[in-house]
């Protein structure tokens, strides 16, 4: 994710994250650990960072569109995010974002401020495989 030249999907992803959390901002995940932010390498630092690793892997499996640029449809039903639309690629991107938002919520207790604005150069371990 990159804030410069922000496109549609980043805003949607931010809204999904914020919808699943109370008083916790999407921006706390930018440049967190080894995988939250643009790119990624090494071993995820904690469960929160692993959410980003899994999200990156999910995006890598999406075929037929650019996950970081597309806009998809979704709604909230009884407190749950529901991905909509007929396009399989857009639904897949939405599902990646939905699962990540839930993962962040479920792992809020692992969030460690020492990994905020973490340098990718400190992620020297061998990268995990998707």
From Swiss-Prot:
Where does it mainly reside? secreted
A Pfam family annotated for this chain is Phospholip_A2_1
Q: Which superkingdom does the taxonomy of this entry point to?
A: Eukaryota
For whether the record's keyword set contains Membrane, the answer is: no
Q: What catalytic reaction does the record list?
A: a 1,2-diacyl-sn-glycero-3-phosphocholine + H2O = a 1-acyl-sn-glycero-3-phosphocholine + a fatty acid + H(+)
Kindly list the places in or outside the cell where this protein is found, as annotated in its UniProt entry: Secreted
GO terms of molecular function: calcium ion binding; calcium-dependent phospholipase A2 activity; phospholipid binding; toxin activity
Which cysteines share a disulfide bond?
A: 34-123, 36-52, 51-103, 57-130, 58-96, 65-89, 83-94
Identify the catalytic residues. 55, 97
SMART domains registered for this protein in UniProt: PA2c (SM00085)
Q: What does this protein do?
A: Monomer: Snake venom phospholipase A2 (PLA2) that shows a high PLA2 activity (2110 umol/min/mg).
Query: Belongs to which family?
Result: Belongs to the phospholipase A2 family. Group II subfamily. D49 sub-subfamily.
The protein's assembly and partners: Heterodimer of an acidic protein having phospholipase A2 activity (B chain) and an A chain which weakly inhibits the B chain enzymatic activity but potentiates its lethal potency.
What else the UniProt entry mentions is: Negative results: does not provoke hemorrhage.
Name of the protein this chain belongs to: Acidic phospholipase A2 daboiatoxin B chain
